[in-house]
């Protein structure tokens, strides 16, 4: 929110695997989303036929375009604009390929070429450690020491919106030796092994 408040770019991108996913996880976020952070200074609407949240900031109006990125042709919805901030939820569910003209991820990066204050923020839930999101992006940027790159690993214990009591109830629902516990509770990258 601080970046949107002060940045010089007008148009920004919020993406999820679907538009609904992006709106729920970034726009609303159970009362912690952009529409809560800018309460009284924002309104939902359309921007060139795209779902959007219009923000009224210290530096003028900002438009956050919401897009789904999970399908092979999702990139088409984000063409034609330059974006300052790109915030993506569950980035590992976005469509990616080696073709930079069709990969939602690569097209979104390319749409930031003219940004004055570019910023990329991603979240993801752990998945197969061999998923290309790790090798092609996360680990690649860690290894190249890209200026401004920051990777943070969080577990359920880092989620301040969940009470200690509720957190323990959630943990009790899992077998601590299961892949699901490792993924959902510990935030580890792992894959199920053996017979299903």
Write out the residue ranges for each language-model feature:
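Phosphate/NTP-binding elements of NTP-utilizing enzymes
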Residues: 1-196
């Amino acid at each position: 929110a601080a970046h949107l408040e002060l940045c010089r770019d007008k148009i920004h991108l919020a993406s999820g695997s679907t538009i609904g996913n992006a709106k729920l996880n970034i726009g609303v976020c159970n009362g912690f989303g952009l529409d809560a952070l800018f309460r009284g200074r924002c309104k939902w609407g359309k921007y060139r036929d795209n779902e959007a949240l219009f923000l009224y900031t210290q530096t003028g109006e900002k438009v956050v375009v919401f897009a789904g990125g999970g399908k092979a042709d999702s990139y088409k919805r984000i063409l034609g604009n330059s974006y300052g901030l790109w915030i993506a939820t569950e980035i590992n569910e976005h469509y990616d390929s080696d073709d930079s003209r069709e990969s939602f991820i690569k097209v979104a990066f390319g749409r930031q070429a003219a940004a004055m204050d570019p910023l990329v923020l991603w979240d993801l839930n752990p998945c197969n450690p061999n998923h290309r999101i790790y090798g092609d992006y996360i680990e690649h940027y860690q290894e190249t020491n890209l200026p401004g790159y920051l990777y943070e690993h969080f577990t359920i214990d880092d989620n301040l919106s969940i009470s200690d009591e509720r957190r323990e109830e959630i943990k009790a629902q899992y077998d601590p030796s299961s892949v699901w516990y490792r993924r959902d509770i510990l935030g580890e990258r792992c894959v199920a092994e053996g017979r299903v």
